[in-house]
UniProtKB/Swiss-Prot annotation:
GO terms for cellular component: cytosol. The lineage of its organism: Eukaryota, Fungi, Dikarya, Ascomycota, Taphrinomycotina. This is Probable 6-phosphofructo-2-kinase PB17E12.14c. The active site is at residues 281, 312, 540, 608. Residues 46-56, 65-86, 164-184 have a biased composition (Polar residues). One of its GO terms (biological process) is fructose metabolic process. ATP binds at residues 197-204.
Length: 668
């Protein structure tokens, strides 16, 4: 029994604890000079000797208590005040669960259940009763050395770092802690997108779509095409297939030089023109080239790199892309048959050394996206960052299916006649007439487009059987792999299947806002033939306290607001509950734009002035300074047809006297 007691005493003696005051302590006025800059008592070699050994683990301190564990048998006090301090060996609760020290002033109980002695020198620190926070954890110290360390630096002074998160134009801002004011928050992240892929695989198509999307979201985005740089700086305008032969060392060095010069131009644009997303458009077909690009970009710490590879194994898509190349800058005004053979040879040169994205990039922990057959399959690896995530999101939601996108404003409303903004007015008689004729007009155009699809299908079936086609009006024979269906059918290869002709019958959607004037404009569409849906995202911009006023009334009642709007219409936000800016509406419409890109069928959007401006600005790729000033009058209908080479636009004006829509030159 006595042996057990001695054993317990030994264990108890080896587990002696001391209390080190927390950082929430409030010093007595006379003792301020005895504290260091972190509020801790100043310690010197003459006070005591502590060594930070952190012998207590996080499991020993379940509530992050400021526990300082000290082995008493190695203590070496030189200061008499500390030597005379009552040091009480206190066992842990597991050794003495019934121990009770009452209210002794020199002992403090902590949340883990143990007790700690207060050295006399520290009793002048008046303790607060607030619980210790995680930020004020104190390291453990052991009197196991002859040299006293400096006062321990709190945990947060070691590891606290400024975070970096998404910056959205018009939606995020920097708040100053000094006066609570807000400032614009330019994106800290800059994204360099590096394209990868063989020629005629749709890289430039993806590039153009991404440039338009990022710029529409108000991120400054620009593409840098190595081919354009080569044509601009080469000694002659056309390089035949031999220039792309990997065994041609002189040409290979020249191509590498063009690539690095183009990359330098991208970095210069980042630095000098506040670029946010730069796209490096080239084949970048080998791991060696891609590694050189990463090494080059790594010199700039604020740039994130994302590779996007475009893969296409659909012969019809490749054929269509090849035909587009034959009318491009490398083969313009040249013999089409000879140009086709040269381009095919160029592709074979690249195929000899082509290395797809994969293990080599994964071993380097690089970010990449593989887009297969224009978005039918998308593979993403190690995607991090808001801007890179936007690219993945967008590439998952676009296609090349032939379709029509119609955009118009609602018919004339009562508030339009009165000149009042906002509100929820009904249509005038003229507005209802426009609505009725609009339904008939869309019916007519729907039938015309359907007939065009059938005609194209018949023509392509004939070409597939006879193996001939024409370029620039010249007829020549082609092999099956080089057959080039028309833009309309090749974009959706499934329409070429004779057993699946029902795909030629395109469904149709009609979208309105939640406001009466928009819903009433769709009233004459047959619900059996059109999917009619009202969307709150399509509501007109909310004008806050200016809702229901004319512009003259705003100028008179709120002159400062009137002038502020004139100075910066895109960024100006109407004051008052729910007031919005153009940038607010852009992000409200983001899901609408992505859904339009995703859909393979027709849609008519019946919106409002700001809504129509923003949607058309997206498809046109308008500059940010032009978006808020596009001319989109009432009773004008816009038709948008996505194509592999871009977008076709048509404009139709309504004549209320003849009740007809006539096509006019597109203008905004």
């Amino acid at each position: 029994m006595s042996n057990n007691n001695n054993k317990d005493d030994s264990e108890l003696q080896s587990r002696t604890h001391y209390y080190n005051p927390d950082r929430t302590a409030i010093p007595v006025k006379d003792d301020v000079d005895q504290l260091d800059k972190f509020g801790s008592p100043k310690l010197s070699a003459n006070d005591h000797s502590f060594t930070n050994t952190d012998s207590v683990t996080s499991e020993d301190r379940p509530f992050s208590s400021p526990v300082s564990t000290l082995t008493s048998n190695s203590a070496n006090f030189s200061d008499s005040s500390l030597q005379n301090s009552p040091v009480h060996p206190i066992p842990s609760p597991a050794l003495s669960p019934t121990l009770n020290l009452g209210s002794r002033p020199d002992v403090k109980r902590v949340s883990s259940g143990g007790y700690f002695a207060l050295p006399k020198q520290l009793t002048s620190i008046r303790q607060t009763h607030r619980p210790m926070s995680q930020q004020h954890r104190v390291p453990s110290f052991h009197p196991a050395s002859d040299t006293a360390p400096p006062s321990p630096i709190p945990f947060h002074h070691h590891l606290r770092k400024k975070g970096s998160s998404m910056s959205i134009p018009g939606q995020t801002s920097i708040v100053s802690s000094n006066n609570g004011s807000e400032a614009t928050n330019p994106p800290e992240e800059k994204l360099a997108i590096i394209m990868v892929g063989l020629p005629a695989r749709g890289k430039s198509y993806i590039v153009n779509k991404l440039v338009r999307y990022y710029n529409w979201l108000q991120y400054n985005c620009k593409a840098f095409n190595v081919g354009n740089f080569r044509r601009k700086h080469a000694s002659h305008s056309h390089d035949d297939a031999s220039f792309f032969d990997p065994s041609n060392e002189e040409a290979s060095k020249l191509r590498e030089s063009f690539a690095m010069d183009t990359l330098d131009a991208l970095l210069q644009w980042f630095e000098e023109e506040d670029g946010v997303v730069g796209i490096f458009d080239a084949t970048n077909s080998t791991s060696k080239r891609r590694k050189a690009i990463v090494d080059h970009l790594s010199k700039v710490p604020y740039v994130t790199t994302l590779f996007i590879e475009s893969i296409c194994n659909d012969e019809q898509l490749i054929a269509a892309n090849m035909r587009m190349k034959l009318v491009g800058p490398d083969y313009k005004d040249l013999n089409p048959e000879q140009s086709l053979r040269d381009f095919q040879e160029r592709v074979r040169m690249y195929e000899r050394k082509y290395e797809p994205l994969g293990k080599s990039e994964e071993d380097l922990n690089l970010r990449y996206i593989k887009v297969i057959n224009v978005g039918k399959k998308v593979v993403a690896f190690n995607i991090r960052g808001f801007l890179a995530g936007q690219a993945v999101f967008f590439l998952l939601n676009f296609n090349l299916s032939p379709r029509q996108i119609w955009v118009t404003r609602h018919g004339e409303s009562v508030d339009n006649v009165r000149g009042r903004i906002g509100g929820n007015a009904e249509l005038t008689p003229l507005g209802r007439q426009f609505s009725e004729d609009l339904a008939l007009f869309i019916d007519e155009k729907r039938d015309e487009f359907q007939e065009r699809l059938y005609n194209d299908y018949s023509k392509e079936s004939h070409l597939l059987q006879h193996g001939s086609h024409s370029f620039n009006g010249k007829q020549f024979e082609t092999s099956f792999n080089c057959l080039t269906p028309s833009e309309n059918t090749v974009n959706d290869p499934q329409v070429l299947d004779p057993e699946d002709e029902e795909r030629l019958e395109k469904p149709y959607s009609v979208w309105t806002s939640m406001m009466q004037r928009s819903i009433q404009t769709a009233a004459y569409f047959d619900e059996e033939q059109y999917d009619i849906k009202a969307m709150r995202m399509l509501n007109e911009i909310c004008s806050g306290i200016c809702d229901g006023l004319t512009y003259e009334e705003i100028k008179s009642i709120y002159p400062k607001e009137y002038e502020a709007r004139k100075l910066d219409k895109l960024n100006y936000r109407y004051p008052g509950s729910g007031g919005e800016s153009y940038l607010d509406v852009i992000y409200r419409l983001q899901s609408v734009i992505v859904e339009i890109e995703r859909m393979k069928h027709h849609v008519l959007v019946i919106g409002h002035r700001v809504i129509t401006r923003i949607i058309i600005a997206y498809f046109l790729g308008c500059r940010r300074e032009d978006i808020a000033y596009l001319n989109v009058p009432l009773h004008t209908v816009y038709c948008i047809e996505p194509q592999p080479y871009g977008t076709d636009f048509y404009q139709y004006n309504y004549d209320p006297n003849t009740r007809k829509f006539s096509r006019v030159p597109f203008s905004l």
